[in-house]
C-alpha cells in the first residue's frame, strides 16, 4: 500500500461531552466493535470495580471521571481509527482544548434527557472555531428523555449549527422499540433477534404502535421543513449529522460508527507560524506535541509525549529536529495506545497519534521536523489560570521527589507553576479546584511526596515584557512572579488592583492569555 493510500485510511477524532453524558461508554463500545476489548459493559463501575478502558489513572478510577485525554487506536472496515477520549470535567478544559488541535473531526455526545449542557457548549465553541466536522450522538434512548424535535431545535438555537437526523427514535425509555434509519431507509430493531427490518416490514411490525405513527409524522415534517443532507456542509462544519441511540445497551452505536467512517474527513494539513499549510501528503515527516503524560505506567515512572503526525511517515529510529531548542532527537522508543496497554510501533503516517518516550526533551506545543525543515507549527492555546495556591513539601527530606513531581506535572500542562520573584515560593495556578485535588493526589501516590497547599484565592494574571521589569512594581496587591518559562508575570489581587497598576505604569504593556 502506498503512503498516500495509508494516509487516506486514517480517521482521527475526539469525543466531547458534558460529564456523565455517556462519552466514556460510547468509547468502550467503539473499541468493542474494533475488536480491542472482549466485552463492553457498564463503564463507570465504581462499586463493581469494572473500570472503563480509557479511564486508566488511579484517581479517574476512584472518582469515575475522565481527567486526562486517552488515546486509542483500532481498525474497522478498512479504516485506521484514532480516538481521543477527552476529559469531560470543566477543570480539565485546557487538556481538552489542546487535544482538539490534534483531531480532524469531533463526536459530540449529548444526554437526550438533558440536552445541551454547559461543558458541551464550551467545547463546541472550540470545535466551531476550527471549522472541523461535528457528528452528534443523542445518547440514553433507553431512558425517557426530551422530544427528538426539541433536541434538534436546541442544536440550532444554542450552538448555531444546522442538523440533519440520520435516524429517528421509535419511542424511548421502556417504550423504546428501535430506530427509523432515514439515511439507509430501514428500521433498526431494539428488541428481538433480527437487527434490521425493511420499512415495509416495519409497517406490519408496528401497525398499531402509536409511537410509530408519531415517527412517520415527524419524518414527514422533517422532509418538508428540515435541512437537506449535504456532505460538503458536514465537512465544512456547517451541518451536523445526528444519530440517536443508547451507548449503555450498545444500540445504534455500530450504525453510527459505520456511517461516521463513511463521511468523516481524511487527515488535514496544519498551519505553520508563517501561515503556510503543511499538507499530510508532503513526503517529509512532521508533527507536534499536543500532550505530555507522566506515569502512564507507575511501575516505570515514565513520561510520554503524544505527537500528532501532520505529514509524511514516521519510521523507528529516525532523527527529528526540535526547532524550539535547535537540537535533534532520535525517535527510537515509540508506542501506540489502547488506553493503558501499548505496543511498540515501527512506522506510522500522517493522521496517527504516537507516543514518544520523553526524558525531559519535549514540551507541549513542540514541533518535530526532519532534514533541513526547521519550521514551527502555530502555537497551541494556553490559558490564564484563575485560582492559586502556595505549595511546599510537607517533609523537607522529600525535596527531590517534590521537585521532580512538580516539574513533570507542570510539563504535562495539568497545572501551571509560578515562582515568587522575591521569596522564591512556589505558586500553582489552575482553572478549577479539581486540578489542585488531582495534583495533590498524584504527588502523594506517584511521587511519594506529600504537599502542603495554602489557598491564595482568585487572581487576575498579566504577563509583561522582561524589558519593563522592575521589582519595585511588586506589592501585596500585585505579586511579581515568573512562569515556568521564566517570563515575568503579575498576579493582581483583583481588577481594581490591575487598573490601579495600569494607571500608575501606563507604558508597561500587560498581556493576557486565553
UniProtKB/Swiss-Prot annotation:
It comes from the Bacteria. GTP binds at residues 17-24, 85-89, 139-142. InterPro entries: EF-G-like_DII, EFG_III/V, G_TR_CS, P-loop_NTPase, PrfC, RF3_C, RF3_dom_3_sf, RF3_GTP-bd. The keyword Cytoplasm applies. Keywords: Cytoplasm, GTP-binding, Nucleotide-binding, Protein biosynthesis. Residues 8-268 form the tr-type G domain. GO terms for biological process: regulation of translational termination. It is found in: Cytoplasm. Transmembrane segments: none annotated. The keyword GTP-binding applies. Pfam families: EF-G_D2 (PF22042), GTP_EFTU (PF00009), RF3_C (PF16658). One of its GO terms (molecular function) is translation release factor activity, codon specific. One of its GO terms (cellular component) is cytosol. Its main location: cytoplasm. Belongs to the TRAFAC class translation factor GTPase superfamily. Classic translation factor GTPase family. PrfC subfamily. Increases the formation of ribosomal termination complexes and stimulates activities of RF-1 and RF-2. It binds guanine nucleotides and has strong preference for UGA stop codons. It may interact directly with the ribosome. The stimulation of RF-1 and RF-2 is significantly reduced by GTP and GDP, but not by GMP. This is Peptide chain release factor 3. It comes from Streptococcus sanguinis (strain SK36).
